[in-house]
């Protein structure tokens, strides 16, 4: 396919957001800032329609990968700007477009009246555009550029309310931790260019497949895979680099919803999907990915069960579910990882937006479980949507989460080993923390019964209707399993799937089996453990209602352990202090004394030399003749030797 043959909907994916941002920035912001959201919402509608049109093309076997123009060439290396529209990309793109657009609508109501309304929408849509670019990149250099743009936009959004010190610190922490991962991605990119001489995905896949067939894999391939996993752990908040994400809740609720459901944190998982042919050929890397994912999923679920702030509970929930996606990848289930990424986008967006509505009811950016309770009647629509999303997250049949999450846990059970038992803990923990949040927020004692003043009310329609439509996806997205299987199987753009070794690397033969659980499975391990989680949460929040504060009072050390993430956050802060102290030492000793001393000493030496030489310039002709004679004598003596 030539650039002239690219479908118009592919061009509009970029043209509409860019036009909306430029029009909003140059025309509306100086004149009518309160109208900035109008062209952006129109852009969202166009992007959503185009995303589904492209997904339909791929579903019917018309995927494409085309270089649009060459924008950099250095020696033998050349990098093109291209479009890759294939199965994994369009599956995620469709969810990002739909969920992201509805979050934009929600944001129009949520941010109304904020002094930074115009600035928020421009950066928010840039965030949206960056993720579209990341999903449609056809080479590593292009993906890296959009990867960085996603990070910059998230920094601006997390620190949007920069008048708050906590927001500034959270934005800086998120940015700095992601820089650690981004550095790994950059080094991996340099190794890729050095070893493969190209950045294009397909050309790299083919080289890996041929090298594997001939037992001539590059020696640096394990290092490249490890660096890419490191980058994904930072962006997708996996242990040990997960700790930035809970603090990133300082931004407005729409930021949290878009970041957790449809953009930034899913980028790391998608990077591994794109890079799996490079990773899977090293035997010890997939088990490493699975181990990181399983451990993070259990670890974050335990922490989530102890938090009080609604958005922090959901933040640790996101960390846990990203771990489930990493677990699926490590077990070779690319289709399941993509499918759960899509389903997670629906139910996590609903949960965050419902948390925003709860905070809106008490006129706060977020809410604490101690300040709410018994609000199912005061907020009926929010409660209904939250309940649907909670059941989906827990993996209860027939909600969407069952078809994705429980399918992954079923594969993990069959895998055996410690991951088998981790899958049970994940199923139990997910149901426990989300049902605890449900019961403490919408059931139990109302705030006035606790001696607090609160007059909750349902949010305006613009804050409820988008949540309702996303909740439909959380309920019924499980029906997409066959379609996503087909996209993943037939949508690897331009790949000759019959090439020996390549199909095995991608694990394509197993992908159509995603989410095909039997009813017996539904009532078995996954739903059984989820039911136990619900029952335990109900007993500890509704029957023994004082348990949640009683264990904190009786076990302050245990509470401190949970608060510090079992000491990991304390260790990270200690390490950060040591690094900062080292930087200050370098600035004080190396920079001020040694480096400045070297520079000043060089200047003093040059000045002294010039003064010495200046002394010989007496201005008398006899002195100059003497120096000329001496120089001539030296030259003659050297010539006669």
Locate the predicted segments by residue:
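Transmembrane helix-loop-helix hairpins at membrane boundaries of multipass inner-membrane proteins
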Residues: 1-9, 26-122, 196-216, 243, ...
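Membrane-entry segments of alpha-helical transmembrane domains in multi-pass membrane proteins
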Residues: 2-15, 34-38, 78-95, 133-146, ...
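Membrane-interface segments at the starts/ends of alpha-helical transmembrane spans
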Residues: 2-3, 213-215, 411-416, 507-524
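N-terminal signal-anchor/start-transfer transmembrane helix
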Residues: 14-29, 101-102, 233, 237
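Hydrophobic core of alpha-helical transmembrane segments in multi-pass integral membrane proteins
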Residues: 18-22, 44-55, 189, 527-539
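Alpha-helical transmembrane segments
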Residues: 20-25, 102-105, 301-303, 437, ...
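Aromatic-capped, Gly/Pro-kinked transmembrane alpha-helices
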Residues: 76, 484-524, 542-641
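Hydrophobic transmembrane alpha-helices and their helix-loop junctions in integral membrane proteins
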Residues: 88, 102-143, 152-462, 466, ...
């Amino acid at each position: 396919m030539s650039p002239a043959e690219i479908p118009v909907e592919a061009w509009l994916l970029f043209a509409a957001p860019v036009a909306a941002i430029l029009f909003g920035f140059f025309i509306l912001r100086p004149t009518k800032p309160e109208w900035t959201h109008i062209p952006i919402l129109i852009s969202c509608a166009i992007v959503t329609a185009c995303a589904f049109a492209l997904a339909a093309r791929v579903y019917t076997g018309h995927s494409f990968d085309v270089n649009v123009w060459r924008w950099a060439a250095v020696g033998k290396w050349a990098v093109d700007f291209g479009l890759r529209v294939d199965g994994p990309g369009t599956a995620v793109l469709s969810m990002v477009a739909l969920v992201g657009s509805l979050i934009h609508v929600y944001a129009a109501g949520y941010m109304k009246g904020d002094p930074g309304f115009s600035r928020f929408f421009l950066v928010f849509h840039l965030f949206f555009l960056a993720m579209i670019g990341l999903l449609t990149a056809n080479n590593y250099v292009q993906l890296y550029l959009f990867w960085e743009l996603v990070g910059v936009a998230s920094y601006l959004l997390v620190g949007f309310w920069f008048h708050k010190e906590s927001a500034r610190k959270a934005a800086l922490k998120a940015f700095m931790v992601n820089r650690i991962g981004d550095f790994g991605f950059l080094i991996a990119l340099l190794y890729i260019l050095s070893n493969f001489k190209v950045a294009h995905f397909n050309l790299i896949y083919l080289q890996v497949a041929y090298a594997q067939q001939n037992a001539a894999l590059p020696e640096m391939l394990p290092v490249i895979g490890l660096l890419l996993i490191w980058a994904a752990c930072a962006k997708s908040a996996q242990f040990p680099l997960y700790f930035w994400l809970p603090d990133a809740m300082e931004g407005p609720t729409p930021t949290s919803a878009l970041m957790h459901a449809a953009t930034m944190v899913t980028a790391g998982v998608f990077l591994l999907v794109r890079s799996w042919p490079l990773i899977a050929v090293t035997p010890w890397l997939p088990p490493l990915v699975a181990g990181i994912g399983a451990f993070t999923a259990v670890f974050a679920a335990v922490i989530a069960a102890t938090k009080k702030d609604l958005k922090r509970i959901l933040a640790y929930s996101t960390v846990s579910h990203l771990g489930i996606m990493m677990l699926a990848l490590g077990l070779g289930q690319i289709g399941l990882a993509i499918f759960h990424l899509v389903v997670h986008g629906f139910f996590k967006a609903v949960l965050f937006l419902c948390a925003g509505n709860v905070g809106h009811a008490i006129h706060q950016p977020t809410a604490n479980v101690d300040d709410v309770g018994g609000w199912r009647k005061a907020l009926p629509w929010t409660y209904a949507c939250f309940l649907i999303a909670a059941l989906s997250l827990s993996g209860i049949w027939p909600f969407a989460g069952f078809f994705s999450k429980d399918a992954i846990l079923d594969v993990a059970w069959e895998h055996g080993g410690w991951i088998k038992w981790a899958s049970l803990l994940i199923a139990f923990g997910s149901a426990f923390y989300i049902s605890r949040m449900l019961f403490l927020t919408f059931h139990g004692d109302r705030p006035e019964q606790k001696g607090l003043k609160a007059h909750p009310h349902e949010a305006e329609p613009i804050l409820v209707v988008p949540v309702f439509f996303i909740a439909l996806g959380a309920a019924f997205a499980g029906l997409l399993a066959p379609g996503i299987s087909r996209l993943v199987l037939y949508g690897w753009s331009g790949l000759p799937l019959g090439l020996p070794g390549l199909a095995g690397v991608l694990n394509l033969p197993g992908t159509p089996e995603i989410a095909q659980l039997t009813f017996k499975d539904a009532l078995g391990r996954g739903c059984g453990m989820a039911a136990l989680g619900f029952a335990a949460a109900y007993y500890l929040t509704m029957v023994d209602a004082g348990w949640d504060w009683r264990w904190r009072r009786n076990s302050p050390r245990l509470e401190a352990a949970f608060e510090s993430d079992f000491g990991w956050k304390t260790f990270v802060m200690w390490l950060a202090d040591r690094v900062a102290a080292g930087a200050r030492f370098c600035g004080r000793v190396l920079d001020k004394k040694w480096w400045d001393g070297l520079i000043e000493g060089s200047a003093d030496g040059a000045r002294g030399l010039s003064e010495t030489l200046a002394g010989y310039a007496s201005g008398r002709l006899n002195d100059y003749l003497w120096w000329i004679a001496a120089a001539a004598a030296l030259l003659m003596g050297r010539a006669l030797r």
